[in-house]
Amino acid sequence: VEQAKQSAKLMQDEIDDCLKESNFHGEMRHMIEDCARIGSGVVKGPFPIKRTAKVFRDIGGVKEFVTLSEIKPGSKRIDPWNFFPDPACGESIHNGSYTWEREYLSSRQIREMIDMPGYDAQEIIYALKEGPKVSQSRQASDGSQQKAEEQFELWIFYGQCDADDLQAVGVETEDESPKASAMAVMLNDRLVKVTLNVMDSGDFPYDVLAWQRRPSMPWGMGVSRQVRTPQRMLN
């Protein structure tokens, strides 16, 4: 029993460390702000993040300054304007067939993906040589204009795919079902990653919080919409 308690305590510490490293509480506050402002907040996690740390190591009596890279789980807030669930999902995105997430990344962030497991390093290098294909200005969620000339547009897909299509790109399914839950990443119209969904249930690594629920849709109603009628009465 004591050994089980000690193991559980060590695992709890490991989970807490991962949450702190990914600034989980800060991301949740940002997500709640989205909820109050526009009615919905989106959070993603857990998903793999490459983390780098510099430490001193004593090797044979000689101290060396080494750089360590690890893949750690993380969570983050997603801009609701960059998240596109299946329109037929109803009030829960997990009832839909797919989700799309759009990200704008710098060339440095793209280079960091080369060493991450599951990514096609050669396709990423080709995309870096091509440069960003997004050349027009884009509108931010707060209404301001943001230049995307130096940013790459990345699309992340989770959903049901034909088993034959997955096998064509080298992904073997675990049973004879005609469809399987998969994850794919597109960069500059290049397929840089395809793999089966790590969730056996086929659920997506996203959650949507609605400030005030609206029937038949995952998106909620924010504070400004809630007080519209009283504000009109006062005006």
Predicted regions and their residues:
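Extended alpha-helical, oligomerization-prone segments that build pores/tubes and scaffolds
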Residues: V1-N235
